[in-house]
Amino acid sequence: MKVLFISKLEGHKWQGPTHSVPMQIKHQSNIDEVLWVNLCASINPEWKDLPYYRESEKGLKTRLADMPADFQKPDIVVFEGVYEYPFAGLVYDLWARKIPYVAVPRSALTADAQKKKPLKKLLGNMAFFNVFVGKAAAIQYLTAAEQKDSAKWKTPSFVVPNGMLPKERTKQTFSNEGLIFSYIGRMEQYQKGLDLLVSACSRIVRELRAAKVTIHLYGPDREGSFAQLREELARYSLEDIIFLHDGVFGEDKERVQLESDAFIMTSRFEGLPMGMIEALAYGLPALATTGTNLAEEIRDAEAGWTSDNSVDGIAQMLRAAVADKDRYPERSQNALGLSAQYNWQAIAEKTHGEFSNIINRGK
């Protein structure tokens, strides 16, 4: 099977698809003949060393005829994302040649995501994206929760998650005094629910201080996010509880994970957050809202604590995590067990099966 992957990724380390897309394609290449075409220049030099990777700087002008000869008629095409106008030229060729394609929206089609920049989304949907999604052979959602929250889109769909490789080092000991909760990811107040987290902490600030809880947020300062957060922290006098840090990567990121007692993520919406799966793979218990799309799995596995996407719910989740301190080693082992479900090669095999079904339906 010839599978053509199309993306528009600059390769910033703080973006989840920078990590998940290459790993997905790498493991798919063990089963299928793949070509990965990125419709912009990447800052990741290691991608250029991959035998199946190409870069096209034509953007909107990229067409199927620009592909290598053996991939000008692929069996199926995968668009890594939805809201990318550079996909437009290629998709017209696919419609003309009746080549099936799959769109991977990564939460972009959920109800909450559609509320972000709603006018821009409305105009974009009317101009192109309604038809782009509607004519897809299928949408690949990363979780059942994402699929359910994207129910307004009537395109056939299936669920295949992101994966994670096992970690050589995992969490072994927890703090004797106090608790350290960490978040690593984008500092987007709305999507990541950081405003909800700050408000929740303000409700139980005395309890958090008494338990010596500190919450460390790591991520790039983009669009004035740090200034906004610092203003909120000062308003609620939370500067001794919530701390802001620049993004961490590689060995520094691993150190932060292993020095933390739990990973916290209070997102309003996600596809499948690689940061949280990675934290589970280190054996970190998780504090997760329903918007992360992992809350149900974490609750069922007893790998952490969960809440709805409300300030009161997050406050109660924090209380539960503080009260449960003696159970952190047990929840750590459960986190490792949960992360083992996200094996990349098994995911590639499941994806191959879904692609085969799509191709066979079209024959």
Predicted regions and their residues:
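Short hydrophobic beta-strand element within catalytic cores of glycosyltransferases
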Residues: 285-289
